Structure formats: structure tokens, C-alpha cells
Amino acid sequence: SCYDLCQPCGPTPLANSCNEPCVRQCQDSRVVIQPSPVVVTLPGPILSSFPQNTAVGSTSAAVGSILSEQGVPISSGGFSLSGLGGRSYSRYLPC
């Protein structure tokens, strides 16, 4: 067969010396490789919301105290209170 070892060159010498090259070309082999199934995971959509508390035309100072208890600074620019009982015309409150 193609993969047999090279034949010895001539009669067996007293010393191991041989100058004949031993090269053998074998036929090409064909191997069919079936592709394995590939699972691709696509990330799902990221849903986010930005709720905003809105107080418009509040005349009560209780709104300011409730907001300050919840950690919302009154002087943040989104809410203004002009004195106790004063009118405040604000459009939005920071979250």
C-alpha cells in the first residue's frame, strides 16, 4: 500500500549507510464535513420608562413637604414654591 515503509536500498550493508531517497506520493483523500447546527441568540429589546411626577398650579405647602420627604429637593429648578400658600406654576418635577 501507499503507507508501507520504504524498501531497503540494496543488500544489507555492514554499516547503516544508504543514499537512495525514499519519497512516496499518495492519492488525495476526500472528507465530507457536515456543518453542525449553530444557535444564535439575539438579545431581546430593552424596555425602559421614565416616569415623571407633575404638579401644576399647586397652592398647598403640603406638596413641598411630601416631595422633600421623598428625597426630591424643592430647589432643583423643576418645582418652585413662592412662600406658604403662594401659587406655583411648574411644568415638571425631576424623578
UniProtKB/Swiss-Prot annotation:
It comes from the Eukaryota. The modification N-acetylserine is found at residue 1. GO terms for molecular function: structural constituent of cytoskeleton. The keyword Acetylation applies. GO terms for cellular component: intermediate filament. Keywords: Acetylation, Keratin. Pfam families: Keratin (PF02422). Belongs to the avian keratin family. The avian keratins (F-ker, S-ker, C-ker and B-ker) are a complex mixture of very similar polypeptides. This is Feather keratin B-4. It comes from Columba livia. The lineage of its organism: Eukaryota, Metazoa, Chordata, Craniata, Vertebrata.
